Structures are given as structure tokens and as C-alpha cells.
């Protein structure tokens, strides 16, 4: 029996920030169901695919009833009766149906929900895990980066840098690495509490204390790592995401950072000093604005052989924009966010480009998440090498890490059989 798409149904659900988002069910003729929920970002690149929201009085203008209607109407009509096993064909059908460069007519949130749900339905129909359906048999778990201190637009902490992350560079297994991070997370919480600082968490599950500066935050991470019994730089490394587009003045061409106005050259000097002072700092994401390609390229020339420099807002997971970045020598790694581009196929294309150009890849969640663990399977399938999906708090973050534990068991043949 030939299996085809029988029904596609979208609904409005809520994400981890209390905002509406799109969830899609794809039902196949063999009775198989694939379900996917779409995340949403707070710090977004200007050239991201368009998240369609209604903009009216309902739900602060953020409702997604138009995107839902587009799935249940046009997209369903275009895809019904199609085989679910040709992901690229179906994704390109939706891209053509939308007819815009940035998916603004149907909405990237509508298209991505269907794209992800189709992949999951196809995997379920084949009775294999999603990571194996997307990636075949040659698979590996990524190195996880945990956002344990939140700043920027993700928290009201007074720190300009948006994310301070830790990663287990020395680990026997994914579980071993996760346990190390859990130990540091709880140690960090105690250190903050002992200092009388806030231990409430931000959007991504990290703490949001008013530490005053980037250096204070990094020094506090060093303290937590050491007090938990690990060696900074040797066992546990640090990464930051300044999300510098958020504090860049495009008119003055300066960065409003920690009470100062810094030129691109001055900000680069600051980053150089930071890496020299804190050698456990191995990765900087979006150190320069998406509108400051020259600044980003200069950083890559100076620091690109020493540390990882990740492009997020500057590339927005868009293969065409990324090609330009490769040609101009911008960054040495790319962040992959499915909802920045709007289809599984285009995200895979960006990863393929990175591999050919010698760039590293890091899969990422968004600040507005759901309990959908699609990106965990996707990271394993794509040999992404790295992932960041929040801290060790908030179920929508931890669910991705728990999915890696399940996948690790399966890959090691440790799962319970009945």
C-alpha cells in the first residue's frame, strides 16, 4: 500500500513565554501521526523568515490564527495525497506556494510546523526513530552548551551579554557531561544565594542575577566550576552570546556596551582581552551586529584561529546569506535555528554548506520554546557537533537533554526491550 498524506491539521498552542504558537498534526493513510510545535525567538535577526502573527487586539496582537488557517487551507490542499517520504520535495512545494523570499505570505511558523510534522510522521510510519530517519545509521551526539546565566533581552539582569554558557569538553558520555553541568548549576545557585543575588531564572532556564558586568559573570562561572570540583578550560569550558545587534546603534555605528560607546575596533579589543584573561572562554556568538559585517570579519581574522566565532543573526540559517558570509570570511561557525529559515530542508542545506566550507555548526532552540524535542533528534541526525538548548531548568529546555539520554541509550544498545 502506498502511504500518502491524508490530513494536515494545525492548532494554536502556547509556548514557554505564554505566547501563541503553531502546532501541526500530519496524519498519513496508514494511520500514522506526526506532530510538531514551532518555537519563537525574542532576539531575532532582521532577515529571518517571517513569523506570521495577526497583529490585532487578541492576545496582544501575537495570535497565530492566520498561520493556522494557512496550514488547514492552502498548505493542506497542496500536500494532500503526496508521499511523506520526500522531505525536500514537500518543503519546496510549500516554498513555491508561499511565493515570497521570506515566507511572509503563509508564514514561516506555518510552513515549519508542517515540515517538521511531515518528517516525524514519515519516521513513525517507517517505525524508526526520527534521528535515524533523518540521519541514517552513522550518528553522533553533539556537545551540549548550557545557558546558565541569562542577560540581555532574555532577562532583566542589567547585563548586556545575552547568554553565558558552560559546556563539558571532557566527558565519558552525554550523561556524564549532563551530570557535570547539573552539579555546576546547583553550585552556581548556592553561590548566587550566598551573595544575596537573585536565583530566579530567565526565559531559557538560566539564572538572571544582577552581576553588573560580563567579567563578573564569567568570574562567577569560574568559581562555580571550581567549587563543583572541575577544572575550567580543561573539563568545563565557557561560551558567551553577546547578541550584539541588540546594543548596536546602526546610525552612530557604535556599540552601547556596559555604559560605554565602543567602536567595532574597541569592542574587538575588549573581546581579545576577555579571552586572554579567561582562557576557558572558547566560543563567542554574535560578537558583532548583523549590520556590522566588517567588524565580524575583523574579529574572525584576529580571533578565528583561537576560538569559535558563531554567526547567528548575521546568517539567520539562510543558505544564500551564509554563502556571502563564507566568501567574506565572517565567523567560523554557524548557528542553526529551524524557525529562522522555515523548513527542515533549508536547514539541512545550511549545514551542508558549513561542512563544505569548514565551518562548525551548532543547533539552537529559541527563547520561546515548547516541549517538542525535534531539534535533539535533528542534531544527532545531522552530525551537528554542538547544540544549545537552555539550562538545567524549565521543562521545555530539559526535555531536549532528556531526549539525548534516550538516544544515547538506544545507540549504545541499552534500551529495555520487552
Swiss-Prot record:
PANTHER family linked to this entry: ENOLASE (PTHR11902:SF1)
Signal sequence extent: none
Annotated localization: Cytoplasm; Secreted; Cell surface
Name recorded for this polypeptide: Enolase 1
Pathway(s) where this gene product acts: Carbohydrate degradation; glycolysis; pyruvate from D-glyceraldehyde 3-phosphate: step 4/5
Note on cofactor: Binds a second Mg(2+) ion via substrate during catalysis.
Broad enzyme group: lyase
Gene name tied to this protein: eno1
Amino acid at each position: 500500500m502506498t502511504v500518502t498524506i491524508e490530513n494536515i491539521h494545525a492548532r494554536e498552542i502556547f509556548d514557554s513565554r505564554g505566547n501563541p504558537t503553531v502546532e501541526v498534526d500530519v496524519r498519513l493513510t496508514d494511520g500514522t501521526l506526526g506532530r510538531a510545535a514551532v518555537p519563537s525567538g525574542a532576539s531575532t535577526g532582521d532577515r529571518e523568515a517571517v513569523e506570521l502573527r495577526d497583529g490585532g487586539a487578541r492576545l496582544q496582537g501575537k495570535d497565530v490564527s492566520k498561520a493556522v488557517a494557512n496550514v488547514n487551507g492552502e498548505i493542506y490542499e497542496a500536500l494532500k495525497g503526496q508521499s511523506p517520504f520526500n522531505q525536500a520535495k514537500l518543503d519546496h512545494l510549500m516554498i513555491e506556494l508561499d511565493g515570497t523570499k521570506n515566507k511572509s505570505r503563509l508564514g514561516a511558523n506555518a510552513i515549519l510546523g508542517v515540515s517538521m510534522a511531515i518528517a516525524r510522521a514519515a519516521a513513525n510510519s517507517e517505525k524508526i526513530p526520527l534521528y535515524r530517519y533523518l540521519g541514517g545509521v552513522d550518528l553522533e551526539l553533539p556537545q551540549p552548551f548550557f545557558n546558565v546565566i541569562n542577560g540581555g533581552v532574555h532577562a532583566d539582569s542589567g547585563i548586556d551579554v545575552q547568554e553565558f554558557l558552560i559546556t563539558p569538553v571532557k566527558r565519558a558520555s552525554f550523561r556524564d557531561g549532563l551530570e557535570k553541568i547539573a552539579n555546576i548549576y546547583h553550585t552556581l545557585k548556592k553561590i548566587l544565594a550566598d551573595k544575596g543575588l537573585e536565583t530566579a531564572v530567565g526565559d531559557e532556564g538560566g539564572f538572571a542575577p544582577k552581576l553588573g558586568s560580563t567579567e563578573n559573570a564569567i568570574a562567577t562561572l569560574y568559581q562555580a566550576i571550581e567549587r563543583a570540583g572541575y577544572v575550567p578550560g580543561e573539563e568545563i569550558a565557557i561560551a558567551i552570546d553577546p547578541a550584539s545587534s541588540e546594543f548596536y546603534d546602526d546610525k552612530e555605528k557604535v556599540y552601547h556596551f556596559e555604559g560605554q560607546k565602543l567602536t567595532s575596533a574597541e569592542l574587538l579589543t575588549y573581546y581579545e582581552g576577555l579571552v586572554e584573561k579567561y582562557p576557558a572562554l572558547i566560543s563567542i556568538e554574535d560578537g558583532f551586529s548583523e549590520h556590522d559585517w566588517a567588524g565580524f570579519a575583523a574579529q574572525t581574522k584576529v580571533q578565528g584561529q583561537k576560538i569559535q566565532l558563531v554567526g547567528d543573526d548575521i546568517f539567520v540559517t539562510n543558505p544564500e546569506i551564509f554563502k556571502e558570509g563564507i566568501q567574506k570570511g565572517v565567523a567560523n561557525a554557524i548557528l542553526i535555528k529551524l524557525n529562522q529559515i522555515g523548513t527542515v530542508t533549508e536547514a539541512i542545506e545550511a549545514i551542508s554548506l558549513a561542512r563544505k566550507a569548514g565551518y562548525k555548526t551548532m543547533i539552537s532552540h529559541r527563547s520561546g520554546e515548547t516541549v517538542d524535542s525535534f531539534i535533539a533528534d535533528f542534531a544527532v541526525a545531522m552530525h551537528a557537533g554542538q547544540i544549545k538548548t537552555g539550562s538545567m531548568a524549565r521543562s521545555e529546555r530539559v526535555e531536549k537533554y532528556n531526549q539525548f539520554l534516550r538516544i544515547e541509550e538506544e545507540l549504545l544498545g541499552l534500551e529495555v526491550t520487552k
